[in-house]
Amino acid sequence: TQPRYLIGFKNGVYDLRENAFRAHKPEDWLLNHNGITFTQPLAANECLEVHASNFYKWLSHAAGRDAGKMERIKAGLFMVLANRSDWQLFLEITGEGGSGKSVFTHIATLLTGEHNTASGNMAALDSARGRAQFVGKSLILLPDQSKYVGEGTGIKAITGGDLLEIDGKYEKQFSIILQ
């Protein structure tokens, strides 16, 4: 599997241990990247409010201008970017219509890469066939879930780090731990 300390970009990797960007190397074992071209920060004094003003406006709006909430939203997005499922497996994004939930989802998808993202529902997590769409994905979206009536065995197995049966169409069944 991909080392957790590397974030794959189109033009290289960001090494979190070294706190530096560098070129791709075969020994990194990266199978994919997020599709974003990494650019170096403009200066030591770069800040969101000035250099990413539209993002900052959305962040302020989504957090109700609460600095603590803004930090938690940024932490959640960093967790998605760095694929840190060991910190938290699930983020539940709630709020009224127009509060920024969909924007968060779109930013998270951008940071992960569309090819690394899958969308489904709780029922899909409970069936071996339904789980097949999530294999190899680093971001699973379960948008606007209606009332779920089921056992929740799939989500329990994922959070417990258990092996899950996968039954992809026209493929041999196998087991995997989804992270």
Predicted regions and their residues:
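AAA+/SF3 P-loop NTPase mechanochemical coupling elements
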Residues: 129-136, 167-179
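Anionic group-transfer/hydrolysis microenvironments
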Residues: 17, 145, 169
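P-loop NTPase catalytic core of nucleic-acid-dependent motor ATPases
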Residues: 2, 6, 13-138
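Short, well-ordered loop/turn and helix-capping segments at boundaries between secondary-structure elements
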Residues: 83, 110, 114, 147, ...
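Substrate-gripping "pore-loop 1 plus following alpha2 helix"
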Residues: 118-126, 153-172
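A broad "ordered helical/assembly scaffold" signature
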Residues: 77-88, 153, 163, 174-178
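Conserved AAA+/SF3 P-loop NTPase catalytic/coupling segment centered on the Walker-B
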Residues: 138-161, 174-175
